[in-house]
């Protein structure tokens, strides 16, 4: 009986964490959700990916609004594998897998009127967390800082972000 109760509690915890992650995604501002969606599209396009991934949590968010509906976004976040297979349509029942490492993603892009611009090309870099080195993290940030999104002194990472 105790084993059944333990199993029930663990199952409820897994489902709750999946629901919390979906809630975290839905609470992201729209311009950040679009970036997460872009990263997920690129991730599932790889043939080696077998599971569906969901947004797990933000590590760093930064944006610059220049006016005239133009903005620049930098977002560093985690994706987490679920027990659902790649291509699952209804992801509301997908429970997180704890046997797979998180995927650490960094993305930067220009928006106009709330949409991601094709030029300059959005930068998306996602890698399993254990494989991500400090040099790679530095390279990501440097790449986003040097992207020629705008003229002037402001850069994507010059704004004060929120964690």
Q: At which residue positions do the language-model features occur?
A:
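Compact beta-sheet-dominated globular domain cores
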Residues: 85-163
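Exposed beta-strand-loop-beta-strand "reactive/processing" segments of non-cytosolic proteins
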Residues: 53-93, 104
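Classical eukaryotic N-terminal signal peptides for Sec-dependent ER targeting/secretion
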Residues: 1-10
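Short amphipathic alpha-helical molecular recognition features
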Residues: 24-32, 65, 69, 118
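Beta-strand/loop motifs with alternating small/hydrophobic and polar/acidic residues, enriched
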Residues: 2-3, 38-42, 46, 57-66
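N-terminal signal peptide
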Residues: 11-30
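Short, non-transmembrane alpha-helical segments in secretory-pathway proteins
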Residues: 25-52
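Short, flexible/disordered secondary-structure transition segments
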Residues: 8, 46-54, 91
């Amino acid at each position: 009986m105790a084993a059944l109760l333990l199993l029930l509690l663990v199952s409820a915890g897994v489902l709750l964490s999946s629901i919390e992650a979906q809630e975290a995604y839905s609470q992201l501002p729209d311009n950040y959700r679009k970036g997460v969606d872009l990263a997920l599209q690129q991730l599932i396009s790889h043939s080696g990916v077998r599971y569906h991934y969901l947004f797990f949590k933000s590590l760093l968010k930064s944006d610059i609004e220049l006016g005239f509906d133009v903005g620049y976004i930098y977002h560093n976040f985690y994706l987490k594998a679920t027990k659902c297979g790649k291509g699952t349509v209804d992801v509301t029942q997908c429970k997180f897998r704890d046997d797979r490492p998180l995927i650490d993603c960094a993305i930067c892009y220009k928006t106009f009127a709330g949409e991601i611009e094709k030029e300059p090309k959005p930068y998306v870099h996602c890698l399993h967390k254990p494989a991500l080195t400090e040099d790679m993290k530095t390279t990501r940030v440097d790449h986003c800082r040097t992207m020629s999104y705008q003229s002037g002194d402001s850069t994507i990472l010059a704004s004060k972000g929120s964690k």
